[in-house]
């Protein structure tokens, strides 16, 4: 049994946002579903009656991507505002199943490619 009494009495500092890169989208969906359910249950037992902005959301995932150019270079794009939020970035650097085109050839993403995408989102 997990003791969450301290969590029930605390007030969150900022809303949570999860930026899941393509390599980790399935795990991020599971984390998001668990977090949504947990926060809604915890919010329903809120004794103070305070409603915190962004505490209980339908999803904490944000839309982000790292599109690649023909040269193999990429850029990080976040399609919504994350100002004032605690952002967590999820990436699986060992996922070799993803590919991208560079100079007309299909390349598998290496751990370094995933790490570069992580830095682009940050």
Predicted ranges, named:
Residues 1-122:
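PRPP-associated nucleotide enzymes
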């Amino acid at each position: 049994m997990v003791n969450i009494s301290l969590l029930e009495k605390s007030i969150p500092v900022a809303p949570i946002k999860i930026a899941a890169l393509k390599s980790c989208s399935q795990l991020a969906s599971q984390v998001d579903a668990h977090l949504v359910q947990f926060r809604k249950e915890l919010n329903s037992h809120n004794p103070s009656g305070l409603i915190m902005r962004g505490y209980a959301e339908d999803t904490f995932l944000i839309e982000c991507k790292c599109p690649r150019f023909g040269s193999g270079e990429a850029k990080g794009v976040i399609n919504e505002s994350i100002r004032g939020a605690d952002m967590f970035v999820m990436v699986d650097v060992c996922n070799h199943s993803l590919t991208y085109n560079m100079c007309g050839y299909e390349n598998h993403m290496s751990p370094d490619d995933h790490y570069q995408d992580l830095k682009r989102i940050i």
